[in-house]
């Protein structure tokens, strides 16, 4: 569906060349929700804008449904872009147009018949839950409602792909969750492939099938959401999930625990989240486990239980306890303090 082959993009800033995206290759399957996460300046926004050639890559290929977009004529590219919807952090709504007209006007410009416009606007207002707001103006809407209008506008072109550029970063947690649920609904009911970028791990965790991590324009790691959260390999990825593993407990407090034992992050996947493996550790081995924090995350494709545990005991017993936990299906990782 989406294939990026060694895509690179640079800009000239004050006489200096800045490489925003460097040789990035990603394949996104049809119907998948794929996320890209990274710190500010990692190159995420530039990358997502390369997919519909809002930013034309300096090198590499962007292939959508088998077509290399860079080789298309202007007319062919306009047609191809109709199958790629996009939503942004800033909504980009026309302030003097009603909700209905914000969705309808782009369709009019495309030459869509009036009856078809009416049908589509009503359909997608219903999907985003704003049927009763069709005659309202953007100033009368909340941030979440504005984003829903932007989503309906993107869907009205009936795309096969929806690009999301930090679409939830300006929203409060409750509204963010509502928008994420809407994106899941769109993916499930309409079969639309979603490619999103974010700096929020919660967004990746809640709705993505797979994720890529970017740093300084490079793609440094990619895999399933479960693998990234439990088996991170690159230092940048570990920094991202590190705050999750330590539950944002203050560094000075963690240092006190490290001085008297080992801090380990335990992940229980799926049905194993209910298994009493940790409870049996102190009975089988001469170690004293203390649970410092814990929780259960609901991923798109399963459940992930996580605990931050202080294990006190000598090295031999500690090693035996860790081996036992791993044999019980628990993903174990020592917490490294920054």
Swiss-Prot record:
First-listed, main subcellular location of the protein, grouped into a coarse class: membrane
Domain (ABC transporter) ranges: 2-241
SMART domains: AAA, NIL
Provenance organism: Listeria monocytogenes serotype 4b (strain F2365)
Keyword vocabulary terms for this entry: Amino-acid transport, ATP-binding, Cell membrane, Membrane, Nucleotide-binding, Translocase, Transport
Domain of life: Bacteria
Subcellular localization, as worded in the UniProt entry: Cell membrane
PROSITE patterns tied to this protein: ABC_TRANSPORTER_1 (PS00211), ABC_TRANSPORTER_2 (PS50893), METN (PS51264)
Catalytic activity: L-methionine(out) + ATP + H2O = L-methionine(in) + ADP + phosphate + H(+); D-methionine(out) + ATP + H2O = D-methionine(in) + ADP + phosphate + H(+)
Record's function text: Part of the ABC transporter complex MetNIQ involved in methionine import. Responsible for energy coupling to the transport system.
GO cellular component terms attached to this protein's record: plasma membrane
PANTHER family listed in its UniProt record: AMINO ACID IMPORT ATP-BINDING PROTEIN, METHIONINE IMPORT ATP-BINDING PROTEIN METN
Membrane topology qualifier: Peripheral membrane protein
Family the UniProt entry places it in: Belongs to the ABC transporter superfamily. Methionine importer (TC 3.A.1.24) family.
CDD domains given in the database record: ABC_MetN_methionine_transporter
Protein name (record): Methionine import ATP-binding protein MetN 1
GO molecular function: ABC-type D-methionine transporter activity; ATP binding; ATP hydrolysis activity
Gene: metN1
Lineage of origin: Bacteria, Bacillati, Bacillota, Bacilli, Bacillales
EC number: 7.4.2.11
Family annotation (InterPro entries): AAA+_ATPase, ABC_transporter-like_ATP-bd, ABC_transporter-like_CS, ACT-like_dom_sf, MetN_ABC, MetN_ABC_transporter-like, NIL_domain, P-loop_NTPase
Assembly and binders: The complex is composed of two ATP-binding proteins (MetN), two transmembrane proteins (MetI) and a solute-binding protein (MetQ).
Annotated ATP binding sites: 38-45
